[in-house]
């Protein structure tokens, strides 16, 4: 018995350390199989169990786009949306702050970053890039180990009917190095539930200690495993459910400290659970995937899916089935959540997923063009009831998938042509150039997967320059690092321990309502009130709480009240100063304010001593605040104008503003045209010109849920929430019958705004670019900056008009035409870089680039005419013979080459070399050798002999060549040319 338990333990250890996977090695029937249950029923049973039996609140799945978490590419676990609770930073006024016990089914994507299953999808029967995580949570010690284990056991054995003898348990065995004891409490809980000791096994921190990241909340976990073998032979164990008990915090120095509050965080993959309950050895055999696999077979007329892996999967047909089925689910979910295929970050990962799916469907399953988009309705059918956003956006998802598939196929065809053209220039032993492969790849212009490029070359029997490709990849990484936005210096911050201590002491959250205490004077200027406050806490730069700070010390201040706006919601923090009561002549500069779990932390420099309990008076930088207010109100107007112009499907994806400019990211079906950009600006100008009142009011969050047209972001809002309405009182705007939110700007927003729109002055969109397919970033300025942008635009328009007139008059000679072309080139650069209306930039660039083409055409015509004239002069000067060596005036090397070419056309048996003196002693050289004089006499060698004498260089071929040099003795150069040619003839 002991030996069998030890063997089972070793098997479990190996299974865990290889990462849990359904290996599908055993196809014997499962004993005591539970009755088949649809995936939708399994999901519903989980949620209903925790809601109805154990009083959990059901919360919707968060978007797979991480909310304010730059450490993640995608939401990859159920706990992601609850990080503010674990870190203690949740807004105490928000709905989330009231969460005690919750449950949900969370959409998760693991493709890129630390958790990346992309390349494993298709190779086995378990990996997915998209999956659903069923989870239940208890926050702040609502319940802990005993209740969590009891609930999990009850659900699995009583609700789902999984036989107890098929469940195995692992728990934390301790970590002496970290000073952590074995989690015997959890072990004893499982034993008390009747799990035999032989199936309760202990493991170290690698398997049973869960951490959020390098730092942050963490704790021991216990895992429930399912035995696929059902007691027949050795156990085949797969992880089913992970229960994490967060009770520690990993500090920056690597040490562990107890958390102020303990939490329970559990996660169970729906796909794996459904496979168990439906008696399947693979998640792909469940009803979550079978409709997709059937649709793939019908659409591709491929052989049926048989679930084969490895060498048994001849032709990789079943691998392709799994790749396509998984990837179309991921694409559909991501696009419905506003992540579109693009060129960097999550959009780039999504682009790779789409192109991987197209490759497998096209190359292996022989799918027809447009096939991938046809699978979207099947995804919506299987997941749409649980995630309604799939139903709402199904048409957009299908269109985007089909468009990107078509673009990829076009790129593939272009790539084949480029490869064939490049191969024709290579020698038998040459490697394929890394530069060309790079331009074909996902990092270059065409976006082809690099392994596909390598496969195409392999089929041609050509080896890729891998070393060169690695060098280019390193250069690209360095370039991206240089181009990346500089990381903002981390300001003072309150960690989970500091926040926990404040809560333990009963320190109330900062009252920041005074930030809204400002008014509009009859003169049109704003009056910002001061704020009286008391110092409640002081922190040094390293976050240590102190009783006082001294002269010159950078510190953080917590006050009972503040009129400073803390950075959030895309709006920059206020700045200003504070003075101590009775000492108004000593200013304490405040550089920024940040929100930390409901507390506003002011970052200041103390010119003198400051102590706990001191009374202070706060003053915001009025010009800075007013600039932020104008940009924020302008952002709302711009957001509304975009919807009015482009349609109601235009959604804000994010924004950032400061007094200098505003940035707004929005969903767009296609890039904006100049006409649309101008129309958006005009709509904003109209609202500004009407000088409408801006109404702001706090209302219960529930009142905003069903208001048509009201705009909000995927953020956690406080309750009550502030509503900002332009031109319509908030009460009227929130009346669903009024439809007011469809006619004007009405948004949930905690920022500071103008009281009337007229103070925006003007708005000019100065830039736009596609962040990804379907997402556009707009840059805009307001007020005086906008007027300056318009004036500069008009000035450049006049310059373009003048250039047009100059071009229409024509040029007398090549030199004049070249000067005009250079002037037009400088004008193009000026238009491209100017801060001016973007719609006007687009129009002027189209015009000025057309002028450039016309100017170049005029130059070529003048050069041809000049070359013809000089050709005749030279032919008249030289009698018919085998050689012409002479000097001629030419404005450029291209003109000189044309003269040489025309001479040789009119005298085919003559070899020609011409020199053209230029300013500063520079000399141009061009030559061509008659066909009859080769191969002993070559143009490249001829030009090199002459140019090297002049200290220059030459290049070309056996027939034609050119070069440059510098000399004051042209006769000597001509003599060398003559002598060399005669020696070769």
Swiss-Prot record:
Family classification: Belongs to the class-II aminoacyl-tRNA synthetase family.
Effect of residue 77 to V: Found in patient with leukoencephalopathy; uncertain significance
Signal peptide (UniProt feature, chain positions): none
GO molecular function, one term: zinc ion binding
Protein name, entry field: Alanine--tRNA ligase, mitochondrial
Main location: mitochondrion
Protein source organism: Homo sapiens
Cofactor(s), by name: Zn(2+)
């Amino acid at each position: 018995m002991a030996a069998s338990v030890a063997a089972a333990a070793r098997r479990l250890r190996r299974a865990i350390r290889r990462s849990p996977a359904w290996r599908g090695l055993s196809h014997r029937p499962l004993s005591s199989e539970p009755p088949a249950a649809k995936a939708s029923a399994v999901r519903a049973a989980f949620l209903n169990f925790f809601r109805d039996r154990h009083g959990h609140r059901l919360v919707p799945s968060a978007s797979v786009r991480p909310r304010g978490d730059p450490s993640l590419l995608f939401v990859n676990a159920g706990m992601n949306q609850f990080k503010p609770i674990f870190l203690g930073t949740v807004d105490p006024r928000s709905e989330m702050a009231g969460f005690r016990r919750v449950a949900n089914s969370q959409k998760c994507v693991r493709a890129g970053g630390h958790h990346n299953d992309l390349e494993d999808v298709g190779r086995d029967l378990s990996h997915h890039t998209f999956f659903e995580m069923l989870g239940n949570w208890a926050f702040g010690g609502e319940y802990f180990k005993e209740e969590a284990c009891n609930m999990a056991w009850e659900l699995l054995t009583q609700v789902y009917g999984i036989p107890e003898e098929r469940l195995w348990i692992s728990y934390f065995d301790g970590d002496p190095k970290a000073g952590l004891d074995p989690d015997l409490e959890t072990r004893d809980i499982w034993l008390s539930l009747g799990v035999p000791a032989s199936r309760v096994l202990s493991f170290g921190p690698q398997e049973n200690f869960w951490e959020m990241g390098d730092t942050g909340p963490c704790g021991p976990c216990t895992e429930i495993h399912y035995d696929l073998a059902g007691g027949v032979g050795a156990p085949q164990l797969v992880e089913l459910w992970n229960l994490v008990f967060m009770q520690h915090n990993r500090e920056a120095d690597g040490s562990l400290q107890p958390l102020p509050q303990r939490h329970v965080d559990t996660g169970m993959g729906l796909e794996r659970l459904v496979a168990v309950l439906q008696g399947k050895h693979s998640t792909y055999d469940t009803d979550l995937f079978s409709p997709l696999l059937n649709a793939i077979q019908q659409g591709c007329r491929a052989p049926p899916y048989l679930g084969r892996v490895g060498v048994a999967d001849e032709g990789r047909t079943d691998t392709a089935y799994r790749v396509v089925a998984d990837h179309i689910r991921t694409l559909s979910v991501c696009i419905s959540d506003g992540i579109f295929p693009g060129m960097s970050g999550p959009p780039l990962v999504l682009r790779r997923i789409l192109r991987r799916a197209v490759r497998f469907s096209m190359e292996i399953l022989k799918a027809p063009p447009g096939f991938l988009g046809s699978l979207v309705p099947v995804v919506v059918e299987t997941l749409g009831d649980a995630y309604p956003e799939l139903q709402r956006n199904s048409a957009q998802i299908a269109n985007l998938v089909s468009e990107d598939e078509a673009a990829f196929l076009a790129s593939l065809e272009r790539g084949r042509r480029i490869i064939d053209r490049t191969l024709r220039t290579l020698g038998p032993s040459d490697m394929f150039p890394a530069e060309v492969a790079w331009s074909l790849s996902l990092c270059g212009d065409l976006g082809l997967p690099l392994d596909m490029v390598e496969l195409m070359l392999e089929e041609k029997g050509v080896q890729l320059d891998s070393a060169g490709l690695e060098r280019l990849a390193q250069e690209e990484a360095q370039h991206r690092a240089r181009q990346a936005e500089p990381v903002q210096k981390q300001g003072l911050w309150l960690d989970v321990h500091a926040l926990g201590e404040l809560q333990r002491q009963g320190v109330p959250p900062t009252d920041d309502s005074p930030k809204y205490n400002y008014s509009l004077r009859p003169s049109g200027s704003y009056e910002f009130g001061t704020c009286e406050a008391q110092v409640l806490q002081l922190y040094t730069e390293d976050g240590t709480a102190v009783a006082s700070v001294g002269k010159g010390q950078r510190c953080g201040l917590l006050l009972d009240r503040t009129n400073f706006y803390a950075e959030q919601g895309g709006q920059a923090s206020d700045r200003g100063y504070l003075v101590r009561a009775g000492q108004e002549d000593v200013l304490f500069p405040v550089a920024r304010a940040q929100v930390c779990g409901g507390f506003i932390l002011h970052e200041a420099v103390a010119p003198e001593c400051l102590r706990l309990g001191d009374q202070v008076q706060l003053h915001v930088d009025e010009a800075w605040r007013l600039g932020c207010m104008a940009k924020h109100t302008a952002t709302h107007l711009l957001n509304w104008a975009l919807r009015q112009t482009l349609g109601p499907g235009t959604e804000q994806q994010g924004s950032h503003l400061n007094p200098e400019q505003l940035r707004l990211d929005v969903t767009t079906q296609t890039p904006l045209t100049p006409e649309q950009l101008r129309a958006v600006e005009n709509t904003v100008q109209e609202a500004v010109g009407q000088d409408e009142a801006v109404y702001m009011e706090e209302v219960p969050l529930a009142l905003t849920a069903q208001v048509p047209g009201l705009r909000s972001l995927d953020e956690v809002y406080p309750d009550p929430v502030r509503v900002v309405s332009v031109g319509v009182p908030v009460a009227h705007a929130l009346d669903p019958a009024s439809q007011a939110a469809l006619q004007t700007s009405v948004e949930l927003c905690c920022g500071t705004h103008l009281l009337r729109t007229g103070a925006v002055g003007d708005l000019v969109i100065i830039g736009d670019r596609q962040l990804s397919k379907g997402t556009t970033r707009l840059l805009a300025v307001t007020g005086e900056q906008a007027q300056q942008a318009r004036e500069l635009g008009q000035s450049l328009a006049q310059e373009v008009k003048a250039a047009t007139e100059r071009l229409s008059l024509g040029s007398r000679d090549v030199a004049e035409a070249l000067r005009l072309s250079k002037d037009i080139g400088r004008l193009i650069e000026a238009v491209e870089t100017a801060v001016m209306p973007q719609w006007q930039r687009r129009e002027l660039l189209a015009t000025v680039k057309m002028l450039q083409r016309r100017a170049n055409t005029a130059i070529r015509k003048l050069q041809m005419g000049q070359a013809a004239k000089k050709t005749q002069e030279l032919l008249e000067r030289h009698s018919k013979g085998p050689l012409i060596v002479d000097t001629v005036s030419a404005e450029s090397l291209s003109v000189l080459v044309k003269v040489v070419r025309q001479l040789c056309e009119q005298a085919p048996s003559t070899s020609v070399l011409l020199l053209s003196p230029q300013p500063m002693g520079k000399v141009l050289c061009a030559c061509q050798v008659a066909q009859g004089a080769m191969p002993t006499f070559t143009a490249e060698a001829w030009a090199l002999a002459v140019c090297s004498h002049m200290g220059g260089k030459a290049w070309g071929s056996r027939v034609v060549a050119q070069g440059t040099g510098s000399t004051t003795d042209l006769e000597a150069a001509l003599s060398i040319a003559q002598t060399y040619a005669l020696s070769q003839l």
